[in-house]
Amino acid sequence: MTQATDSGFVQPYKGDPFVGHLSTPISDSDFTRAFIGNLPIYRPGLSPILRGLEVGMAHGYFIVGPWTKLGPLRDSAVANLGGLISTIALVLIATICLSAYGLVSFQGKSPEGADPLKTSEGWSQFTGGFFIGAMGGAVVAFFLLENFELVDSIFRGLFNS
């Protein structure tokens, strides 16, 4: 007769039901590890300001769309401008929150050789890069929305000739 301790049954991690881990077939796959490792916050060799710039560009760019299409001005002629202004306001709030996090989390001297993103100066650079990148991403998205017909005609001419 089989015992309840056979490996075919679900067992607690290391035999202790009060200790857990978050290892799943999805989170432990090579694809997931490579994908997460290539995100700018984890990519080796980037300075904090470049990390913030890349994260900010993505966030500024993709936040304009929901504000434009779902915001209170969605049915008006100035929906794109309303989306841009709302995005700028949200980016300002996010930048203030990032700055506050850096002020309370990285107080005092940082040890030599510490990860630059885990120091007060590094986090400040990350926050500055985030702000500049998010503003730039929002303006680019606004420009593309305002000139959609032009961009569409360029791509139609390029690919349908």
UniProtKB/Swiss-Prot annotation:
Membrane topology, record value: Multi-pass membrane protein
Gene3D superfamilies: Photosystem I PsaL, reaction centre subunit XI (1.20.1240.10)
Swiss-Prot/TrEMBL keywords: Membrane, Photosynthesis, Photosystem I, Thylakoid, Transmembrane, Transmembrane helix
GO terms for biological process, alphabetical: photosynthesis
Cellular component, GO annotation: photosystem I reaction center; plasma membrane-derived thylakoid membrane
Transmembrane annotation, as ranges: 84-104, 126-146
Main location group: membrane
Taxonomic superkingdom: Bacteria
Record localization: Cellular thylakoid membrane
Family: Belongs to the PsaL family.
Official protein name in the record: Photosystem I reaction center subunit XI
Gene designation per UniProt: psaL
